[in-house]
């Protein structure tokens, strides 16, 4: 019997709408582009640590990159803002077309898998 075709998706930004975080970054950093810079650095540091064989939870890397970005801009992120950013990242909605597209792919016989650096408790929200 031939194997069923499969598709593997990245979760953050591919399936989930990262842009929902822009208003929070705008409020804290005064610049929506800070969100893209933060996420690019988050991915870069996560990959570098993985290649180096060092496990650091994605949320910890994200927090460190937020602090680094804030420090370079002379911005103090208070506890309320830290909590809001963590909550926004942990509860990003899917892009509008994702649920229907996944249903169509599954209905067409594809096996669907995801890869993510997120902690298990974040993955199940």
Enumerate the language-model features and the residues they cover.
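Active-site neighborhood of HAD-like aspartate-dependent phosphohydrolases
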Residues: 1-43
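A metal-dependent, Asp-based hydrolase signature
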Residues: 46-83
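An amphipathic alpha-helix signature
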Residues: 22, 35, 39, 59-67, ...
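A broad detector of the eukaryotic-type serine/threonine protein kinase catalytic domain
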Residues: 43-47, 90
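Substrate-recognition element of Asp-dependent hydrolases with the DxDx(T/V) motif
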Residues: 80-93, 98-125
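Short helix-capping segments at alpha-helix termini
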Residues: 30-34, 72-77, 107
